[in-house]
Amino acid sequence: STGAAIRLALWLALHTGRAELYDDVERLIRARIIPGQTTEADGRDDPGTAMPRLQLGAWGANQYPHAGKGANPSGTAEIAHTLSAVYQHITAREAAGLVVRMHFDYADDSIEITTSRNEEATTTVRPRVHDNVLLRLPAWAPAETVRITVDGRQISPLTVGRFACVPKELLRVGSEIVLRHALPARQTTETMPAGDTYQFAWRGDEIVGVHPNDWPMPFYPTLETREPD
């Protein structure tokens, strides 16, 4: 299952130090878990679909590869378990400082993280203790688009592996560290065991379109394709 794959990538990243696996954790959550959740919009977009209230916010086996969202207690429990495990490990305070492993909203006594995605990805970190901050840089983010500011001033931090290191000498409690980078567009195709081939449009690590699309309750918007001239 997707949840099991996420947990496997998370544990391998934590216990082997392979930071690139956090990219897999984030991609599976953004490209599969979030789109696969049953929401009120599913009922509005397809009025013929019965939408019991207990089904809202749930997960379960889907009827089609990328549509027909399901909802059952075991599927919902597994995804809740997975997301809880990920949340607990978004950041950690280690000997080197505050380590931001993943780019999701988070808050505890040591740090606050907020994220947004518009024309580009923005991750804002506000340390609540005075320490170094290490920010993981996604491997898929074009290096030339990565920018980091501290309290509005752009810096060029030292990078160690996949992490940008912001020294505590540049920080104070409550400083605002902002990481920005592009969300590159690309397209991929996937052929299912039954022979059906899907075309996906990506923006960063999120799927923003699929062709052909399935109904009801699709995971993604329909990707508009052009016939050859």
How should these model regions be labeled?
Residues A121-P127, A164-P167, Q199-W202, D229:
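Generic recognition of long tandem-repeat/solenoid scaffolds
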Residues A107, D151, R203-G204:
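Short strand-coil-strand connectors
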Residues S1-P138, P142-T145, T159:
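Aromatic (Trp/Tyr) and acidic
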Residues R117, T159-F163, N213-M217:
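A short, sequence-level motif marking secondary-structure junctions
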Residues H181-P228:
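Glycine/proline-rich low-complexity spacer/linker segments in large multi-domain proteins
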Residues A143-P167, Q187-P193:
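Solvent-exposed beta-strand/loop surfaces of large extracellular or lumenal domains
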Residues L137, G174-A185:
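Short, hydrophobic/aromatic-enriched beta-strand segments in well-ordered soluble domains
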